[in-house]
Amino acid sequence: MGSDTSTQLLGTDGIFFDAAWDVRVTDTSLRDGSHHKRHQFTADEVRAIVAALDGAGVPVIEVTHGDGLGGSSFNYGFSKTPEQELIKLAAQTATNAKIAFLMLPGVGTKEDIIEAQGNGGSICRIATHCTEADVSIQHFGLARERGLETVGFLMMSHTISPEKLAKQARIMADAGCQCVYVVDSAGALVLDGVADRVAAVVAELGSDAQVGFHGHENLGLGVANSIEAVRAGAKQIDGSTRRFGAGAGNAPVEALIGVFDKIGVKTGIDFFDIADAAEEVVAPAMPAECLLDRNALIMGYSGVYSSFLKHAIRQGERYGVPAHQLLHRAGERKLIGGQEDQLIDIALEIQRENAANGQ
């Protein structure tokens, strides 16, 4: 799949993209799914999932702590197995798939990128809040200097206009990013909101870089939004097999492939094989199904970063406050990734309000 004869370079040299594909799908079960699993992946689980996804034809598999390189910490949650070990294991297991890793400037370091590459990662995905693309410039420079393929994540893309998002995408592309993603971190975008943002970024970047979309299921629109993104010009799409991701999960890869097959979008992934992988390999590794429940819906409706879910549940139990109330108030305050600790302040605030009201 990754040979010189089967790989077409589109727009920017060095992008892993087979000439037979219309869209490149990245499975992020082993990164976004880390949030749902509280970062407790084992080596055996990663080996089995990578083998199953690779066998189904998934071209890119992302493996990292949920919050990216260096995310194993008190604030975000400690990994059961060091992420660098998992990246190395994934790279050793995959036959055709490329292994991607995520890093957030300020959480991970340039040294982490170098180590991940040494362990077999070949696609470096760098994420910033959608208004802070400038903090990624040096990291893209390093990644390109080292021959890594680069992807940029503009997180919480629902919070700014398509025009402003396009300007931020330009910063990433000029820094060396080969594909800029519109990232619906909260699962808050609805159909046209995705299409308008993707189209604006496509128009801004032209042939300088590809455009991607990363969706969540918090309003039940992960697949539909991904279709809107493709129709607006996106060439890379994220999903998680069995919706294994933060919040209500990501767009399920097996459903994406089924729909893509129906509408004639070629991905190189076999529908039946990915459905088998979801049912027989990924599902057993999940602590529970990713549910579209009240908490998840509140996140999508209020625009809350999807990884807040487990933190809100934990703080809600600790302080005797319903998690959905914490999440709604987090949305009102427009909290972003990295501000999970403020859920404690919100919980104490609601506690005081309840006490004052005799509850």
Curated annotation (Swiss-Prot):
It comes from Mycobacteroides abscessus (strain ATCC 19977 / DSM 44196 / CCUG 20993 / CIP 104536 / JCM 13569 / NCTC 13031 / TMC 1543 / L948). GO terms for molecular function: 2-isopropylmalate synthase activity; 4-hydroxy-2-oxovalerate aldolase activity; manganese ion binding. It comes from the Bacteria. Belongs to the 4-hydroxy-2-oxovalerate aldolase family. Substrate binds at residues 31-32, 185, 214, 305. It is an enzyme of class 4 (lyase). Keywords: Aromatic hydrocarbons catabolism, Lyase, Manganese, Metal-binding. Its EC number is 4.1.3.39. It catalyses: (S)-4-hydroxy-2-oxopentanoate = acetaldehyde + pyruvate. NCBIfam families: 4OH_2_O_val_ald, PRK08195.1. The record marks 31 as: Transition state stabilizer. Residues 23-275 form the Pyruvate carboxyltransferase domain. The active site is at residue 35. GO terms for biological process: catabolic process; L-leucine biosynthetic process. Mn(2+) binds at residues 32, 214, 216. This is 4-hydroxy-2-oxovalerate aldolase 1. InterPro entries: 2-IPM_HCS-like, 4OH_2_O-val_aldolase, Aldolase_TIM, DmpG_comm, DRE_TIM_HOA, PYR_CT. Pfam families: DmpG_comm (PF07836), HMGL-like (PF00682).
